[in-house]
Curated annotation (Swiss-Prot):
Any Gene Ontology CC annotation: cytoplasm
Organism: Pasteurella multocida (strain Pm70)
Function: Necessary for the introduction of cis unsaturation into fatty acids. Catalyzes the dehydration of (3R)-3-hydroxydecanoyl-ACP to E-(2)-decenoyl-ACP and then its isomerization to Z-(3)-decenoyl-ACP. Can catalyze the dehydratase reaction for beta-hydroxyacyl-ACPs with saturated chain lengths up to 16:0, being most active on intermediate chain length.
Taxonomic path: Bacteria, Pseudomonadati, Pseudomonadota, Gammaproteobacteria, Pasteurellales
EC numbers on record: 4.2.1.59, 5.3.3.14
The reaction(s) this protein catalyses: a (3R)-hydroxyacyl-[ACP] = a (2E)-enoyl-[ACP] + H2O; (3R)-hydroxydecanoyl-[ACP] = (2E)-decenoyl-[ACP] + H2O; (2E)-decenoyl-[ACP] = (3Z)-decenoyl-[ACP]
Recorded GO MF terms: (3R)-hydroxyacyl-[acyl-carrier-protein] dehydratase activity; trans-2-decenoyl-acyl-carrier-protein isomerase activity
Family: Belongs to the thioester dehydratase family. FabA subfamily.
HAMAP family for the chain: FabA (MF_00405)
Active-site positions on this chain: H76
The protein's name: 3-hydroxydecanoyl-[acyl-carrier-protein] dehydratase
Any single biological process term in GO: unsaturated fatty acid biosynthetic process
Pathway: Lipid metabolism; fatty acid biosynthesis
Assembly and binders: Homodimer.
Main location: cytoplasm
Length: 177
């Protein structure tokens, strides 16, 4: 369910803010949480609003600074390091869930699916910055709060992943999920 009074509603968030979300401190103990490092896939959210994006239903832009010592580069793959594409997809789901908490949604966030994903590039240790852009399409506020969005992942100025119909739901009880 949605809560009309959302504390800490800002248009940008620092890394410390994102860590607070992972501890359940940003949107309250019954609000959605971001994962903790090493699964947190962003360093900051640089823009959030409820009326922007391609569909005028909300927009999120976040960034990840690429460093050669990020944990996944050491194992994916040995001698051929590349960020797993699924982590970029997960980052987009993380941001849709964060948006649902930002607008007052309550519950535990779970990815529910994606319409289509295209990978047309890769993120290597030599890259500098990844930018995630999420264009909210719809928010359903019933027994289940669900958000749907399109997103893209850009590395050093080039869009390399696109996803349509990213779906995230907020659940009061995940035992039957």
């Amino acid at each position: 369910m949605m809560n009309s009074c959302t504390p800490n509603k800002k248009s940008s968030y620092s890394y410390e803010d994102l860590l607070a979300s992972g501890r359940g401190e940003l949107f309250g103990e019954d609000g959605p949480q971001l994962p903790a490092p090493t699964m947190l896939m962003m360093d900051r959210i640089v823009e959030m609003n409820e009326t922007g994006g391609q569909f005028n239903k909300g927009y999120i832009e976040a960034e990840l600074d690429i460093k050669p010592d990020l944990p996944f580069f050491g194992c994916h793959f040995i001698g051929d390091p590349v960020m797993p594409g699924c982590l970029g997809l997960d980052a987009m789901w993380q941001l849709v869930g964060f948006y649902l908490g930002w607008i007052g949604g309550k519950g535990k966030g779970r990815a529910l699916g994606v319409g289509e994903v295209k990978f047309t590039g890769q993120i290597l240790p030599s890259a500098k910055k990844v930018v995630y852009r999420i264009h909210m399409k719809r928010v359903i506020n019933r027994k289940l709060v669900m958000g749907m969005a399109d997103g893209e992942v850009e590395v050093d100025g080039r869009v390399i992943y696109t996803a349509t119909d990213l779906k995230v739901g907020l659940f009061q009880d995940t035992s039957a999920f």
